[in-house]
A protein has these predicted regions:
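HotDog/MaoC-like acyl-thioester-processing domains
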Residues: 3, 9-14, 69-157, 221-226, ...
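Hot-dog-fold acyl-thioester-processing enzymes
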Residues: 3-65, 113-117, 121-209
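Aromatic side chains
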Residues: 20, 100-103, 172, 186, ...
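Small beta-barrel nucleic-acid-binding modules, principally OB-folds
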Residues: 60-75, 208-220
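Structured core of small recognition/catalytic domains
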Residues: 180-258
């Protein structure tokens, strides 16, 4: 049973220093590395409060992310510090909604530079099926947390007429403990496929270009699987679809200039 009914709604903050290998050609934090920090924060906080993957492992279960919406007003540079605050907003319909606020941390202040919302489910690692979190007593009676005001993701249609197309075979370094391609690896694979000028523009101009990421995880792929990455660019956004060899969408994403 949870320590108290408010344990999932509790806010906790973790600080990160932006390392040299985490920035791009404009010295701005890469988007997929920011996603890694968000997911690592979620994992550490959930473990510390007793409902993370460590608590689920005896049941052969683990948390998996199904969707994320992220808005950034500023992308930090190497050596700068960010603080990521996170909490669970709601558990409903076998899904858990987790929110984040991202702050640029200095000696003078913590300035809000971004916000994100993610949706999670619990995966039975052996059966490869989503399970009802409320079957686990640790989630009984948990109270909802603060609602984060961020626009819902638009419906993303598959890319059918790509500007760029590539293939990728899932490698050892792509696969995580859940035995599938890691969620952050999808974004890296997609961003490596696109036209680099768009991403360079997003991180140029002193990082002042506000951007939004919408990403949906739809179907697992595993070690040795080959996927096709389709990329379509307009003036203000770039959209991706990752397809399996059978033509099913494995992941869809959109990066938009705000």
């Amino acid at each position: 049973m949870p320590l108290n009914r408010y344990y999932m709604a509790q806010k906790q903050t973790i600080q990160f220093e932006i390392a040299y290998q985490e920035v791009d050609m404009n010295n701005r934090l890469r988007l997929y590395t920011l996603e890694e920090h968000l997911l690592n924060t979620a994992g550490k906080v959930a473990d510390s409060l007793g409902f993370g993957t460590q608590a689920l492992r005896p049941y052969n279960c683990a948390w998996i992310i199904t969707r994320m919406m992220l808005e950034m007003d500023y992308m930090p540079t190497q050596g700068e510090h960010i603080c990521i605050e996170t909490w669970v907003e709601q558990n409903a319909h076998m899904l858990s909604t987790r929110n984040y606020r991202i702050y640029l941390h200095t000696a003078a202040e913590d300035r809000l530079i971004g916000r994100a919302k993610s949706v999670w489910a619990i995966l039975d690692i052996n059966k490869r099926e989503i399970v009802n979190m409320f079957d686990h007593p640790m989630f009984a009676g948990a109270v909802d947390g603060e609602v984060l005001d961020i626009t819902r993701s638009p419906r993303m249609l598959p890319v059918t007429e790509p500007d760029v197309e590539s293939t990728h075979t899932v490698r050892y370094s792509d696969v995580d403990y859940n035995r599938h391609c890691n969620s952050c690896k999808y974004l890296q694979i997609m961003m490596d496929t696109c036209l680099p000028s768009f991403l360079s523009e997003c991180s140029a101009d002193s990082g002042k270009q506000a951007i939004r990421l919408d990403i949906n995880y739809q179907k697992e792929v595993y070690l040795g699987d080959t996927v096709t990455v389709l990329c379509k660019q307009t003036e203000n956004d770039i959209q991706y679809t990752v397809k399996t060899v059978t033509g099913q969408a494995s992941c869809s994403a959109k990066i938009t200039k705000l």
